[in-house]
Design a protein with these regions (language model features):
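Membrane-interface helix-loop-helix junctions at transmembrane boundaries of multi-pass membrane enzymes
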Residues: 4-15, 51-71, 189-199, 231-241, ...
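A membrane-periplasm/extracellular boundary helix in multi-pass inner-membrane enzymes
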Residues: 231-270, 283-288, 296
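Transmembrane alpha-helices of multi-pass inner-membrane enzymes
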Residues: 19, 26, 42-50, 354-366, ...
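Aromatic-anchored transmembrane helix interface
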Residues: 72-76, 93-118, 127, 131, ...
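Alpha-helical transmembrane segments of multi-pass inner-membrane proteins
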Residues: 109-112, 126-160, 167-233, 337, ...
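N-terminal signal-anchor transmembrane segment
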Residues: 1-55, 77-90, 361-363
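Hydrophobic, aromatic-rich transmembrane alpha-helices
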Residues: 2-5, 41-58, 181-190, 330-348, ...
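Long extracytoplasmic/lumenal interhelical loops at the membrane interface
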Residues: 266-280, 284, 288, 292-327
Length: 395
């Protein structure tokens, strides 16, 4: 890490500033606070200032050429969303246009900024992973505090509907998203020492389980199963012992925790917590405006929306259905093309660790998080999309 602070043998103010901003942005992804808002704006401004000061227009042009497919799809997606907003002013949310602008700045320009500074060798993949672990570590401290002060109400409670770990966040599903991501990140990013790897996996798995986020459970299980199958030959006895120990812990928790047993039973019984009602409604409404949809944030303002009778049904809870509702089939095509391109890039460059993390996010977003307004999941997806393209960029 220290090498990135220097340029031509001397400390570089540009590099130190960038790494500080990158650390703040990566770490603040896991918290709903002003630091994230400030850091993503500062990162964008720093990118613009560096570009103009050093006149690195050729580097930016080269990056755009190497990422032209995903860039064109992103522009077309935003254009589709903007047209949909214009055609549906009566039902879009009050912050629809602001959210559309932030969609560009938080994800589009940040993606370019990461590619730009990576091309200049300001940081590497390990730095990104380290900064993400910093944020996850801080969040974990708040989870431990909640767990210590409310163990009976969470682990040994008989009410799994209102319980669950949330840490410093307001929502257990968001914590589940982060802890599941931390679990997968620990599996693919921590190589040595194994004691640190296993400790991180244990903590993130425990926190994920008691967030009671079933989407995170399913996503992490599928992603780690995929990663394990790819690395069967490299797994030794220590990994086998850890797996056996984890299964034993799982069985003990199942026996001792009524709330965990309830959530697991709900998962296997197919209890959707109202999601099937939401999804059926979206599919029905999408048939009326299939091409461009209803505009950003329109779900809560549409006639007969499930949220009118059930306030807890306040979001589409499915990435693809949200795209279909807000930007129609056209948006679905462009968004799907971006996803396909990123996954293809991972496979071609053999970045199966990044692919594992993408699989986790994609599965989780089929049940809990959306395509346009879920800044937590989308910020992580932006980082992973950059990592998928980094091999192409550095050629």
């Amino acid at each position: 890490m220290k090498k990135f602070f220097y340029e031509n043998g001397a400390p570089s103010g540009w590099r130190i500033t960038f790494l500080t901003l990158l650390l703040l942005w990566c770490a603040s992804l896991f918290f709903k606070n002003a630091v994230y808002q400030i850091s993503f704006a500062a990162l964008n401004l720093f990118f613009l200032a560096h570009l103009l000061y050093f006149k690195n227009y050729e580097i930016l042009s080269e990056i755009l050429k190497k990422t032209r497919f995903i860039a064109i799809c992103f522009v077309c997606l935003v254009a589709t969303l903007a047209i949909s907003n214009l055609l549906n002013e009566a039902v879009i949310s009050k912050k629809a246009w602001q959210s559309t602008l932030f969609f560009i700045l938080r994800y589009g320009t940040i993606f370019l900024a990461l590619c730009y500074f990576y091309k200049l060798k300001f940081f590497d993949q390990n730095a990104v992973f380290a900064f993400l672990f910093v944020g996850l570590g801080i969040l974990s401290v708040s989870v431990i505090y909640q767990l210590v002060s409310s163990t009976d109400a969470i682990v040994f409670s008989s009410d799994s509907v209102r319980g669950g770990l949330s840490g410093s966040l307001s929502n257990r599903n968001i914590l589940g998203l982060f802890m599941g991501f931390g679990l997968c990140l620990g599996a693919v990013a921590i190589r040595q020492p194994l004691a640190l790897k296993f400790a991180a996996l244990f903590l993130f798995a425990f926190f994920m389980i008691f967030s009671f986020s079933r989407a995170a459970w399913v996503g992490a299980f599928c992603a780690l199963a995929f990663y394990g199958m790819l690395n069967l030959k490299s797994l030794n006895k220590k990994y086998l012992l850890f797996t056996v120990g984890f299964i034993a812990l799982f069985a003990v928790l199942l026996a001792l925790s009524p709330s965990f047993e309830q959530r697991l039973a709900a998962l296997f019984s197919g209890d959707s917590s109202g999601r099937t009602v939401i999804w059926s409604y979206i599919l029905e409404m999408a048939q009326q405006k299939p091409i461009l949809g209803y505009g950003l944030g329109s779900y809560i303002n549409l006639p007969g929306s499930p949220v009118l009778e059930h306030p807890e049904y306040n979001a589409p809870h499915n990435l693809f259905l949200e795209i279909l509702l807000y930007s129609g089939v056209l948006g679905l095509i462009f968004y799907g093309a971006i996803l396909f391109s990123v996954f293809k890039e991972c496979i071609q460059s053999r970045q199966f660790g990044v692919l594992t993390l993408l699989i986790y996010l994609l599965i989780d977003c089929q049940f809990d998080h959306g395509a346009y307004l879920s800044k937590e999941a989308l910020s992580l997806a932006t980082i992973l999309s950059f990592l998928a393209y980094r091999v192409r960029i550095e050629r």
